[in-house]
Curated annotation (Swiss-Prot):
Record GO terms (molecular function): ATP binding; ATP hydrolysis activity; mRNA methyltransferase activity; RNA binding; RNA helicase activity; RNA-directed RNA polymerase activity
Reactions mediated catalytically: RNA(n) + a ribonucleoside 5'-triphosphate = RNA(n+1) + diphosphate; ATP + H2O = ADP + phosphate + H(+)
Domain of life: Viruses
Region entry Helicase, spans: 822-1080
Binding annotation for ATP: G826, V827, P828, G829, C830, G831, K832, T833
Protein name as annotated: Replicase large subunit
Stretches assigned to the (+)RNA virus helicase ATP-binding domain: 794-953
Renumbered residue ranges of the record's region Methyltransferase: 50-452
Domain Alphavirus-like MT: 72-280
Family: Belongs to the ssRNA positive-strand viruses RNA-directed RNA polymerase family.
Length: 1612
């Protein structure tokens, strides 16, 4: 999770800084989806609670060891051996996971309470009391169950449903849950279908291994899963074996094996060593003369070994595996019974068919690697005897000592000198003033004894040398005799004792007449044999899967039945299956019923299974349905006459404004709610309801339910506050408040005052709704106990509206209006309010607005002329109109910001106003109606307003030009503006919300927030008191209003869904101002990025949105040179300061880096380096002093560094960066099959069909001559002395570094020490063999590639690149893809090698040479002779290999071909790790980044751009072709280099730069070049002036010299 969170944070930061703008949204979404998918998968794992207190390291250890579980670490229980005790729960759950749920299971020595808690009523625990400790533990288990039940009883909770069956079984039949018998003697049995299983958690130690198989067979156990502690060291000749991960130790004494925990006082456990070893080493556990249990190890986790014992029937074995053999006992019996018969008859009778099987288990001992067993001698002064023991010591340490002391003279070869040397190399050493730890960690307590052994070994070795020498001179005696003679001369009188000790101790093997040093085996094999007699043959029964298949067949037939329906792909299959299973219904029957309904063959006919159609189907039938049918049958005229004649009726009144009479008496007062029980108000369920009638009626019903749900939710929350009030701080102002009537004080003080209503708790505990009156800030209460209020009960809003709507129903149904409804859809600031004021007739029309602020604003604007036209009667808020309905009719109804309202509310407003026409003004892209009641259903089709006519307004009178540019990305149609302000948007990211203070951080204009919490916090800080507009509002509250200046503030650092580029809240916030908008945020978020992007839009573009701008005519120029670049000479102008300014603008801060002494600082300071296994020669840590080279100093300041000196630390840092710590991102991959598939795709994508065949003759003399012509004479001279009889070691490479650091074109040099580039290369002799070979293979590959579509950039000039891209059609919509891969070389592994080898094979690589090449690139050794570093690498790409460049190019091409449909690609270019693809715009692509991670092990980032960037060059395509510009930023960076040695070197440098940047002389396409640079560098400005300056200085030799000066003189 840390990885996903860090990735998402990086994406947000990049968005704010303007990086990766083209793919940032896609990348963020992908990271989010991956995180959600992984977290959802993790959440489905079984959950285990780990309550013991353990360390953070142990938490990580347990989590990594058991990834199958979601472990929650509470750290709430201190206990002995917490780690091991807590792991027992995990181990038990892991064992039970292996068993099919519900299968009969025996837990051998188990804990019955653990199974009760999990609700496993199918487990029987055998819990024998083998000692007093067992009795105590079983009592403790019973106590835990009692404690658990008491805790439930105290909290008045019942048992969870899943535990009830297990606890009931224990209550009714406890012997079925557990018994006190040994597993071998357990009498419990159950006769149920299915297989039987067993688990043994740390309990098989006490079951004799010879009885285990029979005991399992007695219970007919199918598989037994077991777990036990063990250490491989117990198989060695050692008395103790520590288990470090759980802090325990095994101690062996004879056959007694003790187990105890370290560093604590606990009971010990004792077992039989021989019995434990049998379980470890045996494979077969015979159960009878037919059945045997076969043991297999499963895994080892945290010092616990898991295995399973599977029952095997030997009768299932193939008959041919048995052999004939004689049974000796049967032979003698037959001879006794039939002595008179011949011996042959007796032999035939005793012959039996025997099966023999053998299994071997290898045990690996990691601690004995590179160790030898050295004998130690200890003499006794008292007895005069000598004891011998053994110790394991590092092999390298032993032979280092022996080799060194062999160089001593005879006089110096003493015990003291040997001990002194051993002690010195064991201790820490000082190298160049630095303390370095010895690489050998040998126990100091054995150094003296080891020194004596080394002395004896050296004496013996010298004597052996003399014996061998004399043997060639004396042939009358054996080597052994001469050897003993020399020993006798050396030790004198001690010879007999020494001789006896040497022979008995193993130094001298008399039988073999040789000396031997013992080396322990890393692996020890234990074999187990099984012999069974053949008696019968049976067939292995197949698994019965008929029932699941029958069920699957039924669902398949049912879904086949349903497939005939239209839009069947939207059918919810999961819900269909759940319905059939819950109701136990045949799926086929259900499917036929559904099909019949959908085909109108049954009732409930509707076309589509949508809520709207279902509502129509459930609507009541018209009352005159029968009469309609009669008319259709009998009438001879048209069924629907155009003129309808009425017998009688009433004409409408000609005037408006008179009172009208409601069918009901009057609007019911909210007083009906007073003292109403809360239970009568609460909604029991908010599940999706089915509404009937037309869509308008359904919307109105849904709105009434919404009001009821809102009141219900508020009442429910107030009841909860009354229940939870105790323990709260009475002085803390909260959203809710509780007043104690008896005590006369606030138990919980609310923020608001004078609430309209609340919930009161009566003395009998009943809760009722009360309408409140206040006096002196306290509610006037009746005979109540407590009263609860909240911010939702400040006014009667929802109560009043609901009562009004209920009073207007007719027969319980809302009656919609038939007035004409017109929707005016306008952009922000289009003059909707102005249009209302210009159209409305205040005498007979009504204006309704959602909020009070808007209502005041309309009244103020309508009456600004001095004549009062607008009043509180004809301009009202929606809430006021619905709560205080007046019996009056209106001609026209104007609803401002009507789309912010519930559509049912709009329908009610139109109906209750009795208007003839309704004008609903709104914005489909701004904030819609927000459903603020959780879980209340507001279907999507209800959110669409039903209207008769729609008018569109796309001219904004309010918004400045830059905001208009943003709105054009939101609305259909072109949005224009009349505002003269061009730029108005700005953003500022502050360090934190503590910065905001009215005095130090004043905010201009109207202050707006996104959330209520931010609004409240700004109020607390005093901003409302100093604001010119007084009140601070949220974005939602001021929709529809206009201000000159706006300040939007975000104080919440956590992610907000309201703030996204597509959020309507962002659109509303950006469109409230006429002059200026400034956004203050504590985090980088999408709105900051929007502001940043708007600030970069050119004034020319913004002027086009103004309607009063003049008409701009574009000059059309026809083609002059079709297919060629238009050439406009670049003016040679500008100064050095122009280049410096451009560099500082694109890479701010890089020119201020003082890096001259970075290398010196790194060598002097302490460094912590993460180094893999390698050998370092510290004698090379201090380089030989050399005279420092003088270099020219550049005038232009860049991040370039001086060349560095090679040395141990510098080379090691480079090796770590380039070769160590390679990524490991690959998932599970079939290397061979996947590689073959990738190569086939590579071949199909890039190779011309006519040339797709192989070539078997790449090695020719012509190929060798072509290669040799490219080599230097010195290389050929080195090869002249090589005999080529055998190759040097092909798996050995040399390592060196480049002295000049690579310049980076980002801001990383400011805080990162750049590692040097490395060169890993073969010897010249190997290159002489494989250089011509791969050069020829490369030539053949490039000849076969479709060069019209794909460019493999090898030895191509800029002109050739331009020619390749010149046929791009600029009229075709396309985009550029770039796959940026970091750590490219060291990310390549075995899979990449397999892909590359298959490609070379297709081209005809020789089989023998291919195998040699493979071995040289599998496990390779690197040696850096300059720095004294040796290490080993696997499969990485070597930077100095003969196939480095073409291999990298092929791999990146194969990578993209495996993920992207290359047949859809327009153009593609590959070079090393660089790639660029032109694809059609909108092409649907797979998740390339994920594929690069999981298949190719690449840390990749995908960029979508308009212009390509390839090998440091910008590819600018246009209607005439394409032009390639060398990166100007890279050029300027090179002009700041610090490695120029002389004027001649400077001139060579200028010429090389002129060659690569020749295209900059053409300024015709500088505009496109600037756009391309802006895609890469977000701070880029128009750099044409800098480009001209570059051309000026490169084209003049003398002028170029002024860019550098040598330190000893002035410029020049």
């Amino acid at each position: 999770m840390a990885h996903f969170q860090q990735t998402m944070n990086n994406k947000v930061i990049e968005a704010g800084m303007g990086r990766n703008s083209l793919i940032n949204d896609l990348a963020q979404r992908r990271v989010y989806d991956n995180a959600v998918e992984e977290l959802n998968h993790r959440s489905r794992r079984p959950k285990v609670n780990f309550s013991k207190v353990i360390s953070q390291e142990q938490i990580i250890q347990a989590t990594n060891a058991y990834p199958e579980f979601e472990i929650t670490f509470y750290n709430t229980q201190l206990a002995v051996h917490s780690m091991a005790g807590g792991l027992r729960a995990l181990e038990l759950e892991y064992l039970m996971m292996q068993i099919p749920f519900g299968s009969i299971t025996y837990d051998i020595g188990g804990n019955f309470s653990a199974h009760l808690y999990k609700g496993r009523d199918y487990v029987h625990c055998c819990m024998p009391n083998l000692d007093i400790r067992d009795v105590a533990r079983h009592i403790n288990q019973q106590d835990t169950v009692s404690t658990y039940l008491a805790r439930l009883e105290r909290s008045k909770r019942g048992l969870p449903v899943f535990q009830q069956s297990a606890f009931n079984k224990y209550m009714n039949d406890p012997d079925a849950v557990c018994c006190d018998k040994r597993f071998q003697d357990c009498s419990y049995s159950v006769d149920l279908p299915g297989k039987t299983y067993a688990v043994a958690l740390h309990s098989i130690y006490d079951i004799p291994a010879d009885e285990f198989g029979a005991a399992l067979l007695r219970k007919d156990v199918h598989i037994c899963y077991a777990a036990f502690h063990f250490s491989e060291n117990l198989l060695l000749e050692t008395t103790s074996a520590p288990l470090d991960e759980i802090g325990a130790t095994f101690y062996k004494s004879g056959d007694r094996l003790s187990f105890f925990f370290q560093n604590e006082s606990t009971l010990n456990y004792e077992h039989s060593y021989k019995n434990v070893i049998k379980y470890v080493c045996k494979t077969f556990f015979p159960a009878s003369n037919r059945f045997v249990y076969h043991k297999e190890f499963m895994c080892t986790r945290v010092n616990t070994w898991f295995c399973k014992f599977t029952k095997v029937d030997t009768y299932f074995l193939f008959r041919g595996v048995y052999t004939r053999g004689e049974d000796s006992e049967q032979f003698y019996t037959a001879m006794d019974e039939a002595w008179e018969y011949k011996k042959t008859l007796a032999m035939l009778k005793c012959e039996r068919t025997i099966f023999r099987d053998r299994a071997a288990v290898n045990f690996w001992f990691p601690k004995v690697k590179d160790m030898v067993i050295v004998p130690l001698f200890d003499g006794s002064v008292t007895s005069g005897k000598m004891k011998r023991s053994e110790v394991m010591v590092n092999k390298d340490f032993v032979y280092t000592v022996l080799n060194h002391i062999r160089t001593y003279q005879d006089k110096a070869l003493t015990y003291k000198n040997v001990l002194s040397f051993v002690e010195s190399i064991r201790s820490r050493v000082i190298i160049n003033g630095v303390s370095a730890r010895s690489e050998w960690d040998v126990d100091k307590s054995v150094l003296q004894a080891l020194s004596m052994t080394f002395l004896l070994q050296t004496k013996l070795a010298e004597a052996k040398d003399q014996v061998v020498l004399k043997k060639f001179q004396k042939f009358d005696d054996t080597v052994t005799n001469l050897f003993w003679k020399q020993i006798s001369d050396a030790v004198g009188d001690l010879f007999p004792s020494i001789k006896e000790t040497l022979i008995s101790g193993g130094f001298v093997k008399v039988a073999e007449q040789s000396l031997q040093i013992k080396t322990p085996d890393e692996y020890i094999t234990f074999a187990d044999k099984l012999v069974m007699e053949y008696k019968a043959t049976e067939e292995l029964q197949h698994l019965d899967i008929s029932k699941p298949l029958e069920r699957a067949e039924k669902y398949y037939n049912a879904l086949s039945e349903l497939s005939v329906l239209k839009e069947c792909d939207e059918f919810d299959i999961t819900q269909f299956k759940n319905l059939c299973e819950e109701k136990d219904i045949d799926p086929d029957v259900v499917a036929k019923v559904i099909v019949a309904i959908m085909k109108n063959e049954l009732t409930l006919p509707f076309k589509n299974p949508t809520p709207e159609a279902l509502s129509d189907a459930l609507s009541p039938l018209p009352k005159d349905l029968d009469m309609r049918f009669d008319l259709l049958k009998l009438s001879t005229c048209a069924p629907f006459p155009s003129v309808k004649t009425l017998d009688s009726g009433l004409l409408p009144k000609q005037s408006y404004g008179d009172e009208r009479q409601f069918e009901s008496q009057s609007v019911v007062s909210v007083s009906d709610f007073h003292l109403k029980s809360v239970e009568s108000v609460k909604m029991k369920s908010m599940s999706s309801a089915v509404y009937t009638g037309p869509l308008k009626v359904q919307q109105m019903k849904n709105y009434m339910d919404y009001l009821s749900a809102s009141i219900s939710a508020t009442v429910s929350n107030l009841c909860k506050v009354l229940k939870d009030v105790y323990g709260a701080d009475p002085e803390s102002a909260e959203k809710s408040g509780v007043y104690d009537v008896v005590k006369g004080k606030w138990l919980l003080k609310p923020k608001g005052k004078c609430h309209a209503w609340g919930v009161a708790e009566l003395n009998n505990g009943e809760k009722v709704i009360v309408l409140l009156e206040w006096a002196d800030g306290f509610p006037i209460c009746g005979d109540w106990r407590r009263v609860a209020v909240s911010s939702d009960s400040l006014i009667y809003s929802d109560m009043g509206k609901l009562q009004t709507l209920l009073s207007c129903l007719k027969d319980g149904e809302p009656v919609p209006s038939d007035a004409k409804v017109t929707l005016v859809d306008g952009v922000p600031g289009c003059g909707k309010t102005k249009e209302i004021l210009e159209t409305v007739n205040f005498d007979e029309d009504l204006i309704l607005v959602p909020g009070k602020e808007a209502c005041k604003m309309i009244i103020k604007r309508a009456n600004k002329s001095g004549h009062v036209r607008a009043t509180k009667d004809n301009v009202r808020t929606v809430d006021s109109f619905l709560m205080h309905l007046k019996p009056k009719t209106y001609n026209k109804l104007f609803i401002d910001e009507g789309l912010m309202l519930h559509t049912g509310c709009v329908n009610f407003l139109i109906a209750l106003s009795h208007c003839r026409e309704a004008m609903v003004f709104g914005d489909t892209e701004q904030i819609p109606f927000i459903n603020r009641v959780a879980n209340f259903p507001y279907p999507k089709h209800f959110a669409t307003l039903v209207y008769d006519h729609r008018e569109v307004r796309r001219l904004s009178l309010r918004c400045p030009a830059d905001v208009t540019h943003f709105m054009n990305s939101k609305y259909d149609g072109k949005v224009l503006c009349t505002n003269d302000v061009i730029r108005s948007v700005d953003a500022e990211v502050v360090r934190g919300k503590g910065v905001f203070n009215p005095k130090s951080k004043p905010l201009k204009g109207k202050i707006i927030t996104f959330t209520q919490s931010d609004k409240a916090e700004l109020k607390e800080r005093g901003y409302e008191e100093v604001s010119t507009f007084g009140e601070i509002n949220t974005v939602h509250e001021i929709q529809g209003e206009t201000f000159e200046d706006v300040s939007v503030v975000r104080l919440t650092p956590t992610p907000l869904e309201l703030i996204s580029k597509s959020s309507p809240h962002v659109l509303v916030a950006l469109t409230r101002h006429t002059k200026s908008f400034k956004y203050y945020s504590v985090v980088l978020d999408p709105l900051v990025k929007v502001c940043s992007d708007l600030s970069k839009v050119s004034d020319f573009i913004l002027d086009m949105y103004k309607v009063d701008a003049g008409i701009l005519x574009q000059l059309q120029v026809g083609s002059i040179f079709k297919g060629e670049n238009l050439f406009v000479p670049c003016p040679k102008s500008g100064y050095i300061s122009d280049m410096q300014f451009y560099y500082d603008t694109l890479l701010p801060g890089n020119s201020t880096i003082l890096n001259e002494y970075d290398a010196v600082t790194m060598n002097l300071r302490e460094n912590n380096l993460n180094v893999k296994d390698c050998t370092i020669d510290f004698s090379k840590s201090v380089s030989v002093p050399r005279q420092q080279q003088e270099f020219f100093t550049p005038v232009i300041r860049t991040a370039a560094e001086r060349p560095r000196s090679r040395g141990l630390l510098e080379n090691l840092v480079a090796m770590i960066k380039r070769n160590f710590n390679s990524p490991d991102l690959t998932g599970i991959l079939d290397i061979e099959d996947t590689a073959e598939l990738v190569v086939n795709k590579f071949w199909d994508a890039y190779i011309i069909d006519e040339l797709s065949g192989g070539n078997v003759t790449p090695m020719t003399s012509d190929a060798f001559h072509r290669w040799m012509a490219k080599q230097e004479k010195s290389t050929i001279g080195q090869l002249a002395d090589f005999d080529f009889v055998d190759l040097p070691a092909i798996d050995q490479y040399k390592h060196m570094i480049k002295a000049q650091p690579k310049q980076k074109l980002d801001l990383s040099p400011q805080d990162e020490y750049a590692a040097l580039q490395t060169i890993v290369y073969h010897s010249k002799q190997i290159n002489a063999i494989f250089g011509p070979l791969f050069s020829e293979l490369t030539r053949q590959l490039l000849e076969r590639i479709d060069s019209s579509k794909f460019l493999f950039y090898t030895r191509k000039t800029p002109e050739q690149i331009e020619e390749f891209f010149s046929d791009l059609d600029s009229t075709v919509p396309m985009e550029v893809l770039e796959l940026d891969i970091s750590k490219y070389d060291k990310s390549q592994n075995e899979f990449h090698c397999a892909v590359e080898y298959l490609i070379w094979e297709k081209l005809g690589l020789n089989g023998f040479l291919e195998e040699v090449w493979k071995q040289g690139h599998r496990k390779t050794s690197l040696k850096d002779y300059t720095a004294g570093i040796k290490t080993c690498l696997w499969y990485q790409r070597k930077s100095g290999d003969v196939t480095t460049f073409i291999g990298n190019t092929v791999i990146i091409a194969a990578c993209l071909a495996s993920m992207i449909p290359m047949d859809k690609v327009i153009k593609a270019a590959f070079c090393g790790d660089d790639s660029m693809l032109y694809i059609p715009k909108g092409l649907d692509l797979p998740d390339i980044q994920s594929g690069a991670n999981l298949m190719w092990n690449f840390e990749a980032k995908l960029y979508r751009k308009r212009y390509g960037y390839f090998c440091g060059r910008y590819i600018i395509h246009h209607d005439r072709g394409a032009i390639v510009y060398y990166d100007p930023v890279k050029l300027i960076s090179k002009l700041g280099c610090k490695h120029i040695k002389s004027l001649d070197h400077l001139e060579e440098f200028r010429i090389s730069l002129c060659d690569v940047s020749a295209s900059l002389n053409n300024c015709a396409y500088y505009g496109q070049l600037n756009d391309a640079i802006a895609e890469v560098h977000k701070t880029a400005v128009n750099g044409s002036f800098a480009f001209c300056s570059i051309v000026k200085y490169l084209s003049d030799k003398n002028l170029f010299r002024t860019l550098f000066y040598n330190g000893s003189s002035t410029k020049g």
